[in-house]
Swiss-Prot record:
Role this protein plays: Cell wall formation.
Organism listed in the record: Neisseria meningitidis serogroup A / serotype 4A (strain DSM 15465 / Z2491)
Binding sites annotated in the UniProt record for ATP: 129-184
Cofactor: Mg(2+); Mn(2+)
Subcellular location, principal: cytoplasm
Name assigned to this protein: D-alanine--D-alanine ligase
Amino acid sequence: MQNFGKVAVLMGGFSSEREISLDSGTAILNALKSKGIDAYAFDPKETPLSELKAQGFQTAFNILHGTYGEDGAVQGALELLGIPYTGSGVAASAIGMDKYRCKLIWQALGLPVPEFAVLHDDTDFDAVEEKLGLPMFVKPAAEGSSVGVVKVKGKGRLKSVYEELKHFQGEIIAERFIGGGEYSCPVLNGKGLPGIHIIPATEFYDYEAKYNRNDTIYQCPSEDLTEAEESLMRELAVRGAQAIGAEGCVRVDFLKDTDGKLYLLEINTLPGMTGHSLVPKSAAVMGVGFADLCIEILKTAHVG
């Protein structure tokens, strides 16, 4: 096996997704240790990143979610320290974390994305409701794990929802409702893995359904996708990742309309690795166990 040296599993951090990161990090740490890797937990909230060098770490497995973890900040710090790390580089991480600018790139390249609008204090909210229709989704562009996502169903409600969300960093976007199903497709080293059909017991795949409930149904392989649709989803996932320069292990989320058309929703450049997480479920269908998946991701560690 490749010699990775002393490995820091970067987990925790400062974002609203701290607890999820700690869960993912603990699972990864145990998996790496089970494979004989000299791995240790490292929480930047508790210990400055500059200590990585002082403590002799040679590789970083980054599983820091959200702000400062997957937005290019920690990636830049690791570049300066010269420590190889897993996941995408600075630019791809920053773009992937920004749903608005990621959508602009996908649109420019002709990839299918749901119609959306950016909201501001002076937005004509009635016009946006008329344009996108109801229901619609409103979300912060720079949050993950469905933090701050609201389904707007009532006419005249858009402005008040915007007021509730505008304290979040970055743009607030409204998005047309696509009602044919939710899906996700991991990409590892430029190869699309089996897609997953997500059937939440809640109204949509929100934070509660992702992390706190056990009644969300995950179909992998998806029972309602044809072979052609599955192939297209994998192709679109790979193209979506390549469009922003994402590397290593990523996950692209999709919506399917009632007419069967697939839309790219967003990309996660540092997907979760908890017991509820989607990438391990997809890898398992390919015959790759959790510990082996962690090793494959660790092999992608890089600088530059």
